[in-house]
Each structure stands twice: as structure tokens, then as C-alpha cells.
Amino acid sequence: MSDIHRDLEFLHASFQPVAETWLHICKDDLGIEMRVLETLRDEDRQVELKRAGKSQVKLGWHNVGLALDFACFDEKGVYDTDNHSGLYTKCGLVAEAMGGVWGGRWRMRDYGHWEWHEGFTLQQFLDGGKKGVV
């Protein structure tokens, strides 16, 4: 079993301040009870998740520190797994306003996920083709 990284310090240096601001807005300004579940993933963890059917990719934005997963809790402190409270939508809209991609918009919804890569592909990132980020 691989380690699960939850701290924002494990995110890519370009994403850390964005994620910190997002977390502050969601928690402090909007009053949403939430926490970060996972930031950076190593390859072993990604393989585990793919085998378990919890990820569809061999390599993704988590593997380069440009994605995070989070959980929201309703007013009773109950973990909201399907956005019935609308809290994930609020957090997702904040992420999108900051230039992020929110998993709640995908065909296979991933409400508690967002990634920040400013319009470039993972391959461009891996190839070092994005100035100022890599």
C-alpha cells in the first residue's frame, strides 16, 4: 500500500498558492466543512487505484502534483458522497473561477476532484513544453 499525500506542500510549486487560496475561500469565506483527501500520487498508488477501478488512467495530474481530491461534509458533519448538498458545486465553481478543471463537469462525475494546468495537456507538461510551469 502506497502513502497517501494530503498536504498541499506535496503539490507542484505553481499549484500550491492557488490551492491554498481555493481552500481558504471554500472553508473560511463560504463556510464549507471540507478537507483535502489526496494531492500528489506516486506511480504505485496510481496503479492501485486503476486496478481497483477508481481511476481510468495510468498517469494523471495527481502524479505531477497538479490535482487534488477533497471531501465535503453537510451541516450535520456527514460525508457528502454524491453532491446532494451542493457543496461540491460551490467548491468546483471556485476552482473553475481560478482557472481549474472540476471533475463534477465530467461525464463520469468526480465531484471531489479538481486539477490546475492552465489549458495544457499532461503530455505537454511531461515534455517540458509549458514555460514557467515546468
Write out the residue ranges for each language-model feature:
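Residues at alpha-helix termini
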Residues: 29-30, 52, 98
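Acidic helix-start/capping segments at beta-turn-to-alpha-helix junctions
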Residues: 36-47
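Active-site acidic/histidine clusters and adjacent loop/turn architecture
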Residues: 1-35
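Catalytic cores and adjacent binding grooves of peptidoglycan-active enzymes
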Residues: 56-134
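Charged, low-complexity surface patches
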Residues: 15, 38, 83-84
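A structural signal for short, well-ordered beta-strand segments and their strand-loop junctions
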Residues: 31-37, 101-105
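Glycine-rich loop at the start of a catalytic domain that most often binds anionic cofactors/ligands
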Residues: 48-55
